[in-house]
Design a protein with these regions (language model features):
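Flexible loop/turn segments at secondary-structure boundaries
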Residues: 12-13, 45-47, 89-91
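Active-site beta-strand/loop signature of hydrolases that rely on acidic residues for catalysis
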Residues: 18, 29-52, 82
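Catalytic-core segment of enzymes that process non-peptidic bonds
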Residues: 57-117
Length: 117
């Protein structure tokens, strides 16, 4: 298995730019026969998002970007992508969002792992 580690510098709130960086790096990795490309924490939305996490539109935009990246993985032979993002929280602890790593392959989210301290 070939794994590529992508050291990109995402910009907070630049979903289009961050998605483009992710897909450009993944495309280069595909040409090298890579099976999995791993991106940094919060690569989709940028780090640190600070109070932007309180805005529902910010979290929704992150979800749309994840969907776009997942669709890219649908074509046969493309590498899986592991990247960090934010997602709505379904918890009773009062938090609206969660910091997660998502594994994207075959055009969908295959697995997600929430960050815990």
């Amino acid at each position: 298995m070939k794994i590529a580690l992508a050291q990109i510098n995402p910009t907070v709130g630049d979903f289009a730019g961050n998605t483009r960086k992710i897909l450009e790096f993944a495309s280069r990795a595909e040409k090298l026969g890579v099976d999995l490309v791993a991106f940094p924490e919060l690569a989709v939305c940028g780090y640190p998002p600070a109070d932007l996490l309180e805005k529902d539109a910010f979290v929704a935009h992150a979800g749309r970007s994840v969907d776009e990246i997942a669709r890219w993985t649908a074509d046969a032979g493309r590498p899986a992508i592991l990247c960090g993002t934010v997602m709505p929280a379904a918890s009773s602890n009062g938090k609206k969002v969660r910091n997660v790593a998502v594994l994207l392959s075959g055009g969908k989210v295959c697995f997600e792992q929430q960050k815990t301290l």
